[in-house]
Design a protein with these regions (language model features):
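Aromatic-rich peripheral "rim/lid" segments of glycoside hydrolase catalytic domains that contact
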Residues: 290, 302, 316-387
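A solvent-exposed, charged loop/short amphipathic helix patch at secondary-structure junctions
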Residues: 89-96, 140-176
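N-terminal module-boundary/linker segments of secreted carbohydrate-active enzymes
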Residues: 13-66, 91-99
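N-terminal signal peptide
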Residues: 2-5, 9-29, 346-355, 379-387
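Conserved, mostly hydrophobic/aromatic
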Residues: 128, 240, 303, 311
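Aromatic-lined carbohydrate-recognition surfaces of secreted/lumenal glycan-active proteins
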Residues: 167-226, 271-285
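Glycoside hydrolase catalytic-domain groove-lining segments
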Residues: 235-285
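Alpha-helical scaffolding within the catalytic cores
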Residues: 55-57, 112, 218-231, 260-267, ...
Length: 387
């Protein structure tokens, strides 16, 4: 008997070669994180303890930043052109990335990080939310166009006799190089200081579907090419946090589903094996009304079906800055968000159990058909195997 056990133990490394497995069933869950500043509601006697009761991942005592998730809003001192009165812009740290002090920014970023995420062993979601400018030159359109204008002005002053085309090339080159250094070194420092966290920038990878620049569900070829060229950043990213914020006007349920799928297809294409946690908001971003139950279900179910590792429900401070708003959100949690998450978890669990039962049945069939092979494995003498 002892010899048989010894031979079996010696043969255990060979079992996967014959399609055999000793793994136990895994826990099947699609985590949904609560990233809403509902701590502001505590002063009204509303502690939002029901969040965890519904199965959402919530920080201890409803802290906005805690052991599960921590978002850093505009941390450090990224260069930026801050809006001021009269349509003016105030330059912060050089205004544009090619003119900023990286040393100053990283020093301040480290201070902010150590204060906001004090636990060096933090292993949750770590999101850097910086939206003043985009690293790809051509993507700074609309309200972000001042970054291109100011960059051109800088080059005109540096090279007063250059043609406009030469100024454009130089401005583009220096801007994108500076943006690359700031974003990449910030991410690397975050990973160095909190190495167990899942680090990424909010909104990336971009898609811009169903916008004036691309009124289709799929991301444009140009944007996909931009994302491919951002390998320098994505190779350091340990989690992706694309935005799935919905709008109400000029959209309908099916179109919103296509919007979600288009963004997720690009995120999954870029991410490969890196986990994706899309950000969803419980309000439409154009009218600020609560989204329908159907839209909430789609915002959670479609990411799960696409292979995302979870989702993040976000909320703004202005959503919970009064007692009335807090009560409204708590009702919405119990009527829409909570049931949607609960149903999703039950569905995910059923699918997981079903898949596991299929695996077990397949293994039983394999056992019956290949009992002779198993017996042959157990009949081997441990001395037949050389190290």
């Amino acid at each position: 008997m002892r010899l048989q056990v010894g031979v079996l133990v010696a043969c255990l490394p060979l079992l996967p070669l014959f399609g055999l497995s000793l793994e136990e069933p895994k826990e099947y869950i699609f985590p949904v994180y609560w990233n809403v500043p509902t701590f502001q509601c505590h002063k009204y006697g509303l502690n939002f303890s029901r969040v965890k009761d519904w199965g959402l991942q919530q920080n201890y005592q409803d802290e906005f930043r805690g052991e599960e998730i921590a978002i850093l809003y505009d941390p450090g001192e990224f260069p930026a052109l801050l809006p001021a009165s009269g349509g003016r812009r105030i330059q912060r740290n050089g205004g544009v990335p090619q003119e900023g002090s990286l040393t100053r920014h990283l020093s301040l970023f480290q201070g902010h990080l150590e204060k906001l995420i004090p636990n060096v062993n933090f292993s949750g979601l770590a999101i850097i939310d910086f939206e003043h400018w985009r690293p790809v030159w051509r993507q700074n359109w609309g309200s972000l166009s001042p970054y291109r204008d100011f960059s051109r002005l800088i080059e005109k002053r540096r090279h007063p006799f250059w043609f406009s085309s030469m100024v454009e090339v130089e401005a583009t080159y220096r801007y994108e190089l500076g943006a690359r250094v700031f974003l990449l070194d910030t991410l690397r420092l975050g990973k160095k200081l909190r190495p167990l966290a899942k680090w990424g920038y909010y909104g990336f990878p971009f898609c811009f579907n169903y916008t004036p620049y691309n009124n289709r569900a799929a991301c444009s070829y140009e944007v996909q090419l931009d994302n491919d060229n951002m390998y320098w950043l994505f190779s350091e990213t340990t989690a992706y946090y694309p935005s799935l914020y919905l709008k109400y006007n000029d959209m309908y349920s099916t179109k919103r589903q296509r919007f979600i799928k288009g963004r997720l297809e690009e995120a999954m294409r870029v991410a490969q094996e890196v986990p994706v946690y899309p950000y969803v908001w419980y309000k439409y971003h154009d009218n600020h009304q609560f989204i329908t139950k159907e839209d909430m279900v789609n915002l959670l179910k479609i990411p799960k079906d696409y292979g995302c590792k979870g989702a993040v429900i976000w909320g703004a401070s202005r959503d919970v800055n009064s007692r009335e708003k807090c009560i409204a959100l708590q009702s919405y949690l119990d009527e829409v968000i909570g049931p949607a998450v609960k149903d999703l978890h039950e569905e995910t669990f059923r699918e997981g159990i079903s898949d596991h039962e299929v695996d077990e049945n397949s293994e039983e069939e394999f056992d019956e058909d290949d009992m002779e092979l198993k017996e042959k494995i157990l009949s081997y003498d441990v001395r037949d195997f050389e190290v």
